Design a protein with these regions (language model features):
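ABC-type nucleotide-binding domain
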Residues: 1-191
């Protein structure tokens, strides 16, 4: 299949069908067993892999947070820009939660995010992926732990901010992918 810049696509299928493996190949994390992955007409290789990966914002289903502040987890340990931080906090629907905290975005999350709910961790991961303004945004069942209302708000915001981005979504809820240009079913490792 071909994925064009700015296109929104989704992969659906049963657990174990190969959706995540396919996306790992598209991100250059796994080499394909056969065939090739072309980026702008060039084979994805060791020479261009690092540059390609820098264009990707990835939101996994299983989130890892380190024992530091919300802000530093979003900026992934880098020095952070307050305006950019505020922007992604809003985009990830975190502002009311952060406002309710005594220390705001400077609140410690605890080891592995132990002080947070699964939904709060997912929203922090979404903010992290958006922080560096990636050209390609990959959501691997990234909203699965959210309630329907939170998921709808976040997906609406993701579609809005990804109007000029390529969006790749693995989802189990069809309402998550209703705005995609193409939807691919993955079965037994085949599209």
């Amino acid at each position: 299949f071909t994925l064009k810049k700015g296109e929104k696509i989704a992969f659906i299928g049963e657990s174990g069908s190969g959706k995540s493996t396919l996306v790992d190949m598209l991100m250059g994390l796994l080499p394909p067993n056969s065939g090739e992955i072309l980026v702008d007409g060039r084979n994805l290789s060791a020479q261009n892999l690092k540059n390609f990966r820098q264009k990707i914002g990835y939101i996994p289903q299983q989130i890892y947070l380190f024992n530091d502040t919300i802000a530093k987890n979003i900026a992934f340990g880098e020095e952070f820009d307050e305006k950019m931080l505020a922007r992604v906090i809003k985009q990830a629907n975190l502002q009311s939660f952060i406002t309710s905290l005594k220390d705001g975005a400077n609140t410690l999350v605890g080891d592995g995010g132990g002080n947070l709910s699964v939904g709060q961790k997912q929203r922090i991961a979404i903010a992290r992926a958006l922080y560096l303004s990636p050209q390609i945004l990959v959501l691997d069942e990234a909203t699965s732990a959210l309630d329907n209302e939170s998921e709808a708000k976040i997906m609406s915001e993701i579609y809005k901010i990804s109007s000029d981005k390529t969006l790749i979504i693995i989802a189990h809820r069809l309402n998550t992918i209703e705005q995609c240009d193409k939807i691919y079913r993955v079965e037994k490792g085949k599209i």
